[in-house]
A protein has these predicted regions:
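Hydrophobic, aromatic-enriched interface-forming segments
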Residues: 80-179
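Short secondary-structure capping/junction motifs at helix and strand boundaries
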Residues: 24-32, 60-67
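Flexible, glycine-/basic-rich loop-and-beta segments that form/coincide
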Residues: 63-80
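Short alpha-helical segments that sit at the start of domains
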Residues: 171-191, 202
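Active-site-adjacent beta-strand/loop module that shapes the phosphate/pyrophosphate-binding cleft
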Residues: 18, 39-64, 182
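Conserved Nudix-box catalytic region and its N-terminal flanking loop in Nudix hydrolases
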Residues: 1-24, 32-37, 188-213
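Short, positively charged loop/turn segments that connect secondary-structure elements
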Residues: 213-222
Length: 222
């Protein structure tokens, strides 16, 4: 286990665990946050504590020896990918946000919700800020537009399911943890060359550009 006393440090544990699970050695590793909110797990009688880490590795071919596979984080956060312009699911997203804003109990709350949604999702006169990944996820959670928000509520109605924005859910609060990691890496690549931890030994400038764009979720100016 990552936290066993046999490991020399809190970073060596996750490194060894990740390699056993995937066969991949990690380069850059950074501890993020500790997550322990009781309502995030759907279990009222227990608290699950998760210590999260961001680890980078180079892409390699998948091995049948391990029960692991590569996934794009945009499978879980399709609204974060603006490389080809506004995502195709933007209409569903705007509709859900509009209903949440309209359902506010009073004018002040309605105005606050509208301003918050506009700032986080680049609506009205606001520009898209790629670093606000966690804040966008938390807003969608609050607006009950993702499945994780309804866990523990019993059977989910068809109306509620129809309101969900696209994006694969994850167990417990793992999508929230992933959002934290994405936000951290997007901010990190702006002032530290960690992107090279993801690149092969030899690469072209175009490959480097494509990697940065994939992380940032938007095109970069050459």
């Amino acid at each position: 286990r990552p936290s066993e006393l046999a490991h020399r440090s809190l970073q060596s544990g996750p490194r060894a665990w990740a390699e056993r699970q995937t066969g991949l050695g990690l380069g850059y590793v950074e501890q993020l946050y500790t997550f322990a909110d009781r309502d995030r797990t759907g279990a009222a009688d227990q608290r699950i504590i998760s210590i999260s880490y961001l680890g980078l590795t180079r892409e390699q071919a998948e091995s049948s020896q391990y029960e692991a596979s590569w996934r794009s984080w945009y499978d879980y956060f399709p609204w974060e990918d603006h490389r080809l312009g506004i995502p195709t699911m933007e209409k569903t997203l705007r509709s859900g946000l509009a209903e949440w804003i309209a359902a506010a109990p009073d004018r002040t709350t309605r105005s606050h919700r509208r301003q918050r949604a506009a700032r986080l999702f680049g609506l009205e006169d606001h520009l898209w800020n790629e670093d606000l990944v966690l804040q966008r996820y938390e807003l969608l959670y609050e607006a009950r537009l993702i499945p994780e928000a309804l866990r523990g509520d019993g059977a989910t109605s068809k109306t509620a399911v129809a309101a969900f924005v696209p994006g694969d859910p994850m167990i417990l609060d793992h999508r929230r943890i992933l959002a934290t990691g994405i936000a951290r890496l997007r901010a990190k690549i702006k002032y530290r060359p960690v992107v090279f931890e993801l690149m092969p030994d030899t690469f072209t400038l175009l490959q480097l550009q494509r990697c940065v764009e994939a992380l940032a979720g938007k095109l970069v100016h050459k």
